[in-house]
Design a protein with these regions (language model features):
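Well-ordered, non-membrane alpha-helical segments in soluble/globular domains
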Residues: 37-47, 119-130, 170-171
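Charge-dense, low-complexity intrinsically disordered segments
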Residues: 32-39, 161, 197, 201-204, ...
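Long, solvent-exposed, polar/charged low-complexity segments
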Residues: 2-26, 30, 38, 144-191
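Aromatic- and glycine-enriched beta-alpha-beta binding-site module
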Residues: 69-118
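Compact, glycine/acidic-enriched structural inserts
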Residues: 33, 97-149
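Flexible "arm" and connector segments at domain edges
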Residues: 189-227
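Charge-rich, low-complexity N-terminal segments
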Residues: 3-74
Length: 227
């Protein structure tokens, strides 16, 4: 069976309300997993997702939960080739809130194989770097303030208000933000005056130390003023 989707809104509505009900337990090399038994439909769906969400420089994959909100539902991941399938834990996601009838477009990062304290520091680090790129988020995107142990920049769109043209603009905006982050901080290395190589992570660590030292100095000056 083959199913053709004329628009992103039609595709997303199917993923939100139809796809989950057609999944069955299928044996794979990784054990029993939820899949469409209709392989032709599965492949057609994946190809149409790639076509509908084509962004220069990014690859696209259909995933099946959990997404950042830990729901067992289909979602879509966009990522740079160097960050294959979110291997570095950074990607753009499109997920679906069936109960709210909403599409969510977001930037996030994975939290696997890291201690909570490490993730908290990473979240602060990422937020600072994104603020350097875009001090004020545009097009209705916002930071999810409820995610204390991750960084999520997101926008919620109700399917009844969905516009393919507006979503295309939103997608370009958020993926450009993601690509700029990957370009600046993902793989870049700086040359210092001493000809030693230093990564952005090392620069950021030093910046955080300086910020802490400045804060301590400011507190000390304030205390002196009270005497």
């Amino acid at each position: 069976m083959n199913k053709q989707f004329k628009s992103k809104s039609e595709l997303f509505y199917y993923l939100m309300h139809g796809y989950m009900y057609m999944l069955e337990d299928v044996p794979t090399k990784n054990g029993i997993q939820k899949r469409l038994k209709d392989n032709e439909l599965e492949q057609s769906l994946k190809e149409q997702i790639k076509e509908q969400l084509k962004i220069d420089g990014l690859e696209v994959e259909l995933k099946l939960g959990p997404a950042y909100n830990r729901t067992e539902s289909p979602w879509i991941q966009l990522f740079t080739p160097e960050n294959r399938s979110g291997a570095k834990g950074r990607y753009v996601g499109i997920s679906f809130e069936r109960d709210k009838n909403e599409v969510k477009l977001w930037i996030g990062f994975g939290r696997t194989a890291k201690k909570q304290s490490e993730v908290l520091e990473l979240a602060k680090d990422y937020r600072m770097k994104y603020s350097f790129i875009e001090a004020e988020l545009d097009k209705g995107f916002k930071y999810n303030e409820d995610c204390y142990d991750s960084l999520i920049i997101e926008k919620e769109i109700n399917i009844k208000d969905f516009s393919d043209a507006e979503f295309e603009e939103d997608l370009i905006y958020i993926t450009n933000l993601y690509k700029e982050f990957e370009t600046q901080y993902g793989t870049a290395i700086f040359k210092t005056f001493s000809s030693n190589e230093i990564t952005y992570e090392e620069i950021n660590e030093r910046m955080l130390q300086i910020i802490e030292e400045v804060g301590e100095l400011a507190r000390a000056i304030k205390e002196l003023g009270k005497k």
